[in-house]
């Protein structure tokens, strides 16, 4: 049997981290078992579903690299199929028309609540013959009244629910539109889904959906209900904890590999291993290893993983993601070093690509003024002679490379009988405008000869003015 899983978000908002983790687990289970992964958009909530939210979900999935083998399917394009099955169930007697008014249902619930009884439909229309009338009606599934629903959940183990606790679920509204729980069942059946991976908030739907599947003589898939994600303070995850759309993490400078690695460990483990490549995830992932307990979101851990991947992934690959941030920050990279070289130079010093982009601006643009603290410390009168000699030696270089630049700095220090720092730091501030950068010879190389000479001249003028003031 081919394993077939699905991710079925509702396009009523962004793809958040909880949904992304569910998608990842479902995708991994399919990939780990040479199976297929289906993307389905559950857009039956016509009032809340939006094209913008749908586009955001697809963009998030693509950015994460969670490719799908089928879809995206849209439930709103399958209404004819749902109505076909509803008609079939009415014909077979596994569903019925309910003419109870909203007022009657509300009164019934109030009475049940007053008696301390479970609030559920009392079956008033269950065994009545259909009426030849124009009265509005809903269609209800005729849930079994005896026995239990039993299923083995990959995460939670065996679950058993008495049918006495389940009421007759509405499967079509008064306007004829099918309901969520019914559409899901028909979709999973038609699409051949063998395992449903979803959040634990759906676990109460499962017995109802299983009963509908059995009434249709359809195969019942396996289930894995994943625990929720909490904030690091134990409260329900909210925006202040990091419950934002997946693309916000892109905007904030995270690599997809870092977010995927973080999400896979948010409830699943393989020994003590923390860092997983995508291939390792596919190799080791098992649904039965998912933790039952809720997991706490920890932004510091995500940052640590992002730093790891910024340093460990190929600079050329990281550069492709960095390019988006350069454009976002209006940094024109046409005249300057290759982005892969910038990644190699700066990745050790940045937590995010957003940070890396901001710190690389001096490679491509001239700065208006020197950092006040750095200039006060390193562009003093004693820096004038080293800068002037460096300017002369740089002008004489026939080749502009790291080794030649380093030799020029060493020669300047030796000639003036100064420590390397007394030469290197004024040079660093001169060419970057600040007191922090990668190795100064590498920095000067990446800035380029023409820009270096121009900026050293600017620094010399700055120091001279300072002496004369």
Swiss-Prot record:
This is Glutamate--tRNA ligase. Its EC number is 6.1.1.17. Catalyzes the attachment of glutamate to tRNA(Glu) in a two-step reaction: glutamate is first activated by ATP to form Glu-AMP and then transferred to the acceptor end of tRNA(Glu). GO terms for cellular component: cytosol. It comes from Shewanella loihica (strain ATCC BAA-1088 / PV-4). Belongs to the class-I aminoacyl-tRNA synthetase family. Glutamate--tRNA ligase type 1 subfamily. SUPFAM superfamilies: An anticodon-binding domain of class I aminoacyl-tRNA synthetases, Nucleotidylyl transferase. It catalyses: tRNA(Glu) + L-glutamate + ATP = L-glutamyl-tRNA(Glu) + AMP + diphosphate. Its cofactor is Zn(2+).
């Amino acid at each position: 049997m081919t394993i077939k899983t699905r991710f079925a978000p509702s396009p009523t908002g962004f793809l958040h981290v909880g949904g992304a983790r569910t998608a990842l687990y479902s995708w991994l289970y399919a990939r780990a078992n040479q199976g297929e992964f289906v993307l389905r958009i559950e857009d039956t909530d016509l009032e809340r579903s939006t094209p913008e939210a749908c586009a955001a979900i697809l963009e998030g999935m693509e950015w994460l690299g969670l490719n799908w083998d089928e879809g995206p399917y849209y439930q709103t394009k399958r209404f004819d199929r749902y109505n076909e099955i509803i008609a079939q169930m009415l014909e077979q007697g596994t569903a019925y028309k309910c003419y109870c008014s909203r007022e009657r249902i509300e009164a019934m619930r109030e009475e049940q609540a007053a008696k301390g009884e479970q609030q559920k439909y009392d079956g008033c229309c269950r065994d009545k013959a259909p009426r030849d009338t124009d009265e509005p009606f809903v269609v209800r599934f005729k849930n079994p009244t005896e026995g239990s629903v039993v299923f083995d959940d990959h995460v939670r183990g065996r679950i058993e629910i008495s049918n006495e606790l389940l009421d007759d679920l509405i499967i079509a509204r008064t306007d004829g539109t099918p309901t969520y729980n019914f559409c899901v069942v028909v979709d999973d059946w038609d699409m051949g889904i063998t395992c449903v991976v979803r959040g634990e908030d759906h676990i109460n739907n499962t017995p109802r959906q299983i009963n509908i599947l059995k009434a249709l003589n359809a195969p019942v898939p396996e289930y894995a209900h994943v625990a929720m994600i909490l904030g690091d303070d134990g409260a329900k995850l909210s925006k202040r904890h990091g419950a934002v759309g997946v693309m916000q993490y892109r905007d904030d400078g995270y690599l997809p590999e870092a977010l995927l690695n973080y999400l896979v460990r948010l409830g699943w483990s393989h020994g003590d291993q923390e860092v997983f490549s995508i291939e390792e995830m596919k190799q080791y992932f098992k649904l039965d290893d998912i933790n039952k307990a809720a997991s706490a979101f920890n932004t510091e851990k995500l940052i640590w993983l992002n730093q790891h991947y910024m340093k460990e992934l190929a600079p050329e690959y990281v550069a492709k993601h960095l390019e988006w941030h350069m454009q976002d920050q209006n940094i024109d990279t046409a005249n300057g070093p290759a982005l892969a070289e910038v990644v190699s130079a700066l990745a050790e010093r940045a937590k995010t690509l957003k940070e890396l982009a901001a710190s690389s601006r001096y490679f491509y643009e001239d700065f208006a003024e020197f950092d006040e603290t750095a200039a006060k410390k390193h562009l003093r009168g004693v820096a004038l002679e080293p800068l002037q000699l460096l300017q002369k030696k740089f002008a004489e270089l026939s080749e502009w490379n790291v080794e030649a630049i380093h030799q020029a700095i060493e020669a300047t220090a030796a000639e003036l009988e100064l420590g390397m720092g007394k030469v290197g730091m004024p040079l660093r501030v001169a060419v970057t405008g600040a007191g922090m950068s990668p190795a100064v010879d590498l920095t000067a190389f990446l800035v380029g000869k023409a820009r270096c000479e121009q900026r050293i001249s600017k620094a010399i003028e700055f120091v001279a003015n300072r002496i004369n003031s």
